[in-house]
Amino acid sequence: MSEQDVSQAAWIVTLPDHEATEDFARKLAEELKAGDLVTLSGGLGAGKTTFARALVRTLANEPELEVPSPTFTLMQIYDGPLCPIVHADFYRLSGGYELVELGWEEMTENAIALVEWPERAEGALNPDHLDIRLDFAPGGRGRVAMLTGTGTFASRLQRIKAFRNLVDRCGWSDAVRLPMPSDASVIRSYERLIKMNGETALLMISPPRPAGPPVRRGKPYTTIAKLAETVHAFVAMDKGLRALGFSAPYIYGEDLDAGLLLIEDLGVDPVVDEKGPIPERYAEATRLLVKLHSTELPQVLPVTDGIEHEIPPYDLEALLIEVELLADWYVPHIVGTQLSGSARAEFLNLWTEALGEILVGPTTWTLRDYHSPNLIWMAEREGLQRVGLIDFQDAVLGPPAYDVASLLQDARVTVPADLELKLIGLYARERKAADPAFDVSAFARAYAIMAAQRATKILGIFARLDRRDGKPHYLKHLPRIEAYLIRNLAHPALAKLKVWYESYLPRLIPLEDETPPSA
């Protein structure tokens, strides 16, 4: 094992025996996908055959599959459940030019390729790949795997290494991993980990958010809108909510730099059923907000030793850039053209005026996505702890009315107007009981304004998810959000904005003798 090999490796794994080599190959196979290239090298007896056989068998999902050496055939191709697997040995290759004759690029474009003797290809292989070199451990006891990622695989290898270290440290290294359905996030994903005894946990994969293009005064949209840029915000809010006695997930382990968290699995029981909101569960979620909003809350929360998270303010700049999403994405989606400069300026001026009273009102922790996809019913617990909370990393210091509107005008399921009104009344009564100074009429105005702001924003977000992110299934929710917005614009506090929507989005705001779109 040369000093150069060790110095260049991004990850060095000690493999004490034959079984450890096979186990490592199986775990590495979980990380590979169609189009990946893995190059494998090492001296005679270093364990290449053992490693390659275990890797191919795992990828093919056939534990007893025969995996002969491709030394004389150059390539062996296997059918996998997700994609083909190409196992190649280039020892007999004369040069990289022969890959063209073999049709290598076409053969491996949608396959996982494992190549032994990659140096014989003379640099003709994809530069984005994972290189694994096996060698004898010092003293001849076991083997050592030296892994290096090149090109785009360099960052992937760092995440793989961080994940393996995290689950090993937390005692979850042998758990089965199941991907979970993706949410509206373009950078965050989840996996459910299941141990042999049935115990489960969730892996939250939330790498640092890449800086987007500047959109205003040199700042990207995410910074202006106060969206979390690292996993630190989730950790801080999680600890803060748990300290108040709420059912946020316990964090078993973390790698803050990699953006990996191993967290408690709160379950899958929702607050809705096939008919829509379950009133008793929505009522309990409403009471949770009453308790949160009636509590004096810190603005700075600890993340870990020496690191704190300051909850950002939900300021005018953030609120306005959110409503602009309607102009940027929803209007072109519905009307087919952009707003004129004057129409856009009027829109922003009216929203600035409407939000003025919000900005001087009381603030609290605004969790921001407090609605059915992020609320889990935990019947085995008692009281407010039956409401499990997730997806609160974008929390800001904002108006109490925002999260109430987020819940009672749920973006993913229609909340009937009578249930909405009943739960608004529940919230107002219990806030008033906790604090006689609570201003019910001011809250009602704030609710209408923030519900309209949120609906306006979401119309833009769902149109953007379709056009920019290739997620058209969010468009099915537009009629519901439109109906909510119509409901909100009926409040006198939004009279001027209602005229604007009637003028520039007549499809959205019908004439008084027309029937509004159903939810």
Residue ranges and their predicted role:
Residues 67, 71, 75-117:
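Conserved nucleotide-sensing/catalytic segment adjacent to the nucleotide-binding pocket
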Residues 325-334, 400-436, 452-468, 481-489:
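Active-site activation/catalytic loop segments of kinase-like enzymes and analogous catalytic loops
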Residues 458-519:
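ATP/Mg2+ or Mg2+-diphosphate-binding catalytic cores
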Residues 187-194, 203, 292, 352-402, ...:
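Active-site acidic catalytic loop and adjacent metal/ATP-binding pocket
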Residues 297-312, 317-318, 322-366, 379-381, ...:
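An alpha-helical support segment within catalytic cores of ATP-dependent transferases
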Residues 170-196:
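ATP-binding glycine-rich phosphate-binding loop
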Residues 2-6, 11, 105-163:
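Short phosphate-coordinating micro-motif centered on Lys-Gly-acidic
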Residues 193-325, 331-332, 360:
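ATP-binding pocket architecture of kinase catalytic cores
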